[in-house]
């Protein structure tokens, strides 16, 4: 080892060695990418997150977890199954990165698929997938290395090995993240047998159904619709031959869902439906569909308008909250839909105007005094302010945040989308009454998305405090506001 005495060095040499030492010290002390202060850019944000948001439990009031997998306390065989199976966010990114379909939904081996994902990850920088990927590795598996082709094998092996232990089964993951309530997405004809199994064998997280009756609206596909009505009739234990029969069957199932703990409905719609109609023509449209006759587009819209009102009336009778997810245009790639089916990454943002129909729909319910708690979600960011003002047109003082703008959804479930949603809600309503985040996910690994949202929320408020837009003297209230948005508001609002 060469030892140089300071007196033998020139000043420029000393400067050089000093800079080298600084660089070495910097590298040795460099925080991992996912660290305690990830996305928190000032002291106020850090205080709000670490003292308030970080400690709150989770209510995941809208997700697409499979109830059977929860009931069975499913154990995943490897990282590919738990991370890439059914995740159309990742599939879209892989396709965009030039990965052949055989490595995405095809028959290639598990590690081959994972390797292609690892090759894609560096190219997802500035896409939320980059943040989600590394948050999930850190929080779930304790892995702080960045995923790329050089680290793929080691990360795959380490995480897959951990998945073989009891601590990484589905129920254990939910307990680890202190998930108090999960609401799955369920059709009226579903038996809810796995919800009952979970209820009879509790593990610490309430797993409740959500009423999602979209299939009961699809009269434009009479052959499929007839089969669905048969399934619904069997579940309800009655014949369905008229529109009134349909409502009676749905009400029976609605009652059953309520008995099983359901307190939320959800509707995935291109737009609100609010056409004028007569009940005689709705019954005729329904009977014709059962005979295999395809309705006109005008008849489709009238039928949807009628049944959507009836769904909302049922929800009001039981005091449920109803959710409307507006603005998706689905299954746009016909060739790939024919191969892979729905929910495989071929949906997009629609641009249909929603203000007139939305106001007309909600006004009909308000005029009947049958407008229950309602959350409005838009997929097109142009509709943030539209739905925020729509919601506050129908609040009636009976419940804080009774009608409100929902969190950034699907393509807007990212930093910019969340900030724009919260800014619209803040500007045109009450952010403090917001029921907060949901995963909307099919994966047991998605709970760090609640952390992601909370960090964005705290940084948004922290920046306002730093810039003098919020009073520092009100820190106690702002801390409580963060706790409420993270958990308390949802607990009070949904009354699970």
Whereabouts are the PLM-identified features?
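Hard-cation-handling environments
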Residues: 328, 333
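Divalent-cation-assisted or electrostatically stabilized phosphate/pyrophosphate-binding catalytic cores
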Residues: 351-358
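Short, basic/hydrophobic alpha-helical segments
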Residues: 361-367
């Amino acid at each position: 080892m060469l030892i140089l005495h300071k007196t033998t060095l020139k000043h420029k040499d000393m400067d050089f060695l000093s800079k080298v030492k600084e660089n070495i010290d910097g590298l040795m002390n460099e925080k991992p990418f996912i660290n305690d202060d990830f996305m928190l850019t000032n002291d106020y944000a850090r205080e709000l997150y670490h003292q308030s948001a970080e400690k709150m439990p989770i209510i995941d009031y809208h997700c697409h977890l499979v109830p059977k997998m929860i009931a069975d306390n499913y154990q995943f065989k490897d990282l590919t199954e738990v991370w890439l199976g059914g995740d159309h966010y990742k599939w879209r990114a892989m396709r965009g990165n030039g990965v052949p379909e055989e490595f995405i939904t095809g028959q290639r081996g598990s590690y081959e698929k994972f390797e292609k994902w690892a090759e894609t990850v560096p190219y997802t920088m500035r896409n939320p997938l980059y943040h989600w990927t590394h948050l999930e590795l850190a929080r779930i598996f304790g892995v702080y290395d960045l995923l790329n082709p050089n680290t793929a094998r080691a990360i795959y092996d380490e995480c897959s090995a951990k998945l073989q232990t009891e601590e990484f089964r589905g129920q254990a993951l939910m307990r680890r993240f202190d998930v108090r309530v999960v609401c799955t997405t369920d059709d009226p004809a579903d038996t809810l047998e796995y919800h009952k199994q979970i209820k009879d064998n509790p593990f610490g997280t309430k797993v409740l159904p959500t009423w999602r009756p979209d299939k009961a609206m699809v009269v434009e596909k009479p052959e499929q619709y007839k089969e669905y009505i048969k399934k619904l009739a069997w579940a309800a234990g009655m014949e369905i031959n008229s529109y009134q029969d349909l409502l009676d069957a749905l009400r029976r199932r609605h009652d059953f869902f309520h008995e099983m703990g359901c307190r939320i409905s959800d509707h995935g719609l291109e737009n609100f439906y609010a056409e004028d109609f007569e009940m005689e023509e709705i019954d005729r449209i329904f009977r014709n569909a059962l005979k295999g006759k395809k309705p006109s587009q005008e008849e489709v819209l009238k039928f949807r308008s009628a049944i959507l009102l009836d769904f909302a009336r049922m929800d009001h009778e039981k005091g449920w909250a109803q959710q409307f997810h507006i603005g998706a245009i689905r299954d746009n790639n016909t060739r790939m839909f024919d191969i892979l089916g729905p929910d495989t990454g071929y949906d997009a943002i629609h641009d249909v105007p929603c203000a007139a129909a939305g106001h007309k729909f909600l006004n009909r319910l308000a005029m009947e005094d049958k407008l229950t708690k309602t959350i409005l979600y838009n997929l097109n960011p142009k509709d943030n302010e539209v739905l925020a003002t729509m919601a506050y047109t129908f609040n009636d003082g009976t419940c804080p945040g009774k009608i409100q703008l929902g969190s950034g959804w699907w393509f807007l479930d990212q930093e910019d989308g969340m900030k724009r949603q919260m800014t619209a809600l803040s500007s045109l309503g009450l952010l403090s009454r917001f029921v907060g985040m949901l995963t909307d996910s099919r994966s047991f690994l998605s709970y760090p998305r609640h952390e992601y949202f909370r960090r964005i929320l705290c940084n948004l408020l922290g920046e306002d405090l730093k810039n003098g837009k919020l009073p520092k003297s009100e820190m106690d209230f702002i801390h409580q506001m963060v706790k409420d948005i993270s958990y308390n508001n949802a607990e009070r609002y949904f009354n699970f």
